[in-house]
Design a protein with these regions (language model features):
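Extracellular C-terminal loop/segment signatures of secreted glycoproteins
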Residues: 19, 127-149
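C-terminal helix/juxtamembrane-tail motif
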Residues: 149-174
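Long mid-to-C-terminal scaffolding/interaction modules that assemble large complexes
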Residues: 7, 59, 128, 170-171
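A surface-exposed beta-alpha-beta supersecondary segment
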Residues: 84-126
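Extracellular beta-rich globular recognition domains, centered on the fibrinogen C-terminal
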Residues: 1-102
């Protein structure tokens, strides 16, 4: 049975300015936006083998739904800043956007671990994008981004310039 680990149903402010601690323990809001929590992601993925699936809805055409699946998904401990390991892409979402983030540490506005250097946003992709994630120069997969903030709520190669209406991330057993 799939386990929902992320849901962004509007891309406005649900993930905006969430702290390291909030992403660590998880959160939800009354609109249905949700993050399971990095610590639980770590505990789940180091003890079992999981696949990761994204369900994405394009903002350009709300009836178009896309999937991206990764046969390997692992989140390391907080001592590694919840480093991401992902591989084995398949799906109809076009370009393999998440593999660009493989091997990266999680970044939030108050704990900057991304290798970006752009002083306008304090060299921090979470500030620019509006939400925490595994960033590399802000990257190609911005499912925790906020609409109208920086690079927006985005998956490279989706129709309509990559902008999304909704995203969901699921864990399924391999």
């Amino acid at each position: 049975m799939p386990l929902l680990i992320q849901q962004n149903v509007g891309g406005y402010t649900a993930f905006l300015n969430r702290s390291w601690e909030e992403f660590k323990v998880g959160f939800n809001d009354s609109s249905g936006n949700y993050w399971l929590g990095n610590e639980l992601l770590h505990q789940l993925t180091v003890t079992n083998r999981y696949k990761l699936r994204f369900d994405l809805q394009s903002r350009a055409n709300h009836s178009n739904h896309y999937t991206a699946e990764y046969s390997t998904f692992l989140v390391l401990s907080e001592q590694t800043n919840y480093m991401l390991h992902v591989s084995g892409y398949s799906g109809n979402a076009g370009y393999d956007a998440l593999s660009h983030h493989n091997g990266l540490m999680f970044t939030t506005y108050d704990r900057d671990n991304d290798p970006w250097t752009y002083s306008r946003y304090n060299n921090n992709c979470a500030v620019y994008e509006g939400g925490g994630f595994w960033y590399k120069n802000c990257g190609y997969c911005r499912v925790n981004g906020a609409r109208g903030v920086g690079g927006d709520f985005y998956w490279l190669s989706l129709p309509g310039g990559g902008l999304m209406q909704t995203s969901r991330m699921w864990l399924t057993c391999r």
